[in-house]
Amino acid sequence: MRLKTALWVAAYLRRCQVEGAFAVVRRRGAEEAGAVFVRISRLDGTSDLFGPAPQSALDTSRGADRAFTASFAQQPASDAAVEAKLEREMKFDSDLWIV
């Protein structure tokens, strides 16, 4: 059984805080099963973006853990490219979360 997305995001934010990183929920999606995108701003006009891994890439030995994959082949990407990608994803899936 997979954790509800809202609980997973809350735990992820707490983990970031414990590690000394600043993290916020930029967009709140579906409480139960929304996809999660993690954006890491490098504060220099570039960002890394990670999204849900395709089902074919999931490791069944890890159970129901969430898996992520880089959204751009060349990381970091420009902030404009990351924003454009997120806008396209939001049009496709209105239930997604952005952290």
Specify the residue positions occupied by each region the protein language model found.
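Short, intrinsically disordered, mixed-charge
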Residues: 11-18, 43, 52-55, 88-91
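Long, hydrophobic N-terminal alpha-helical segment
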Residues: 1-35
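Short, well-structured hydrophobic secondary-structure segments
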Residues: 22-55
